[in-house]
């Protein structure tokens, strides 16, 4: 019995060039889960965005890239390899084959499923690697996978499908977060820990608050597991895409507000991402870090009820890297897969 596991993440362009970014961005934005406007309107909007936006983002991709390629893709490939090793080392009568797929770009969901078909897998586990169940992302992954599986049915392959919608409540994931934060940051009096998640449309949350509830629960667990006062661990959301109503408060504004209130030590962790990407690396660890470190912090002492500016002291900023290949994360993924197929 061979169980196929598809580890699915959002994706990345093939290269940090305008020529590579345009088709990637177009595929991303044309997904009705991302932009729900009727097709003709969506196509017109996307055509306009794609004609302009890559010129503004290509420098960020170039800054994120390394000579070896996309760090996000490299980490994702390692995760798939480690998960396959972990699954097979803990299995007596099953063989697991893990493939990596991206919802947008390469390697595609279609190519991943074809690889599992050729391996004659008897069951398929779809595992979008979003710890919290964000419908826009995971839902789109499931829909695309089932669309491609429908095509493969014509070749006589119709295995049972197991969908994993979240794994934020698996203890191994919680423990991995605790260890990761503790490794990179130590709380001192006056510190604040900002727990930042990818934002999503407020209209989606009103229909189904599962994602928001799981983000809140994760923030609460982090505070409890680290023994921090709840008021020192702040929930926020990053990377809103346009002018529509998005889930807030926004991370950048939260950090600015903390500086205005005299906080001089800020740590940001992004538990919703299992691999560092352009959002975490550029928006948070570069741009937000530069803002914090180049804005004079305020003293904890106040004058007349207002924090006093100390030009000789600047705020410190810590970014906790994504879990990546952390053994605790791999164990959480292994447990999620075995639970789904037991």
Question: Residues of each region from the PLM?
Answer:
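Active-site-proximal alpha-helix that buttresses catalytic centers in soluble enzyme cores
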Residues: 1-342
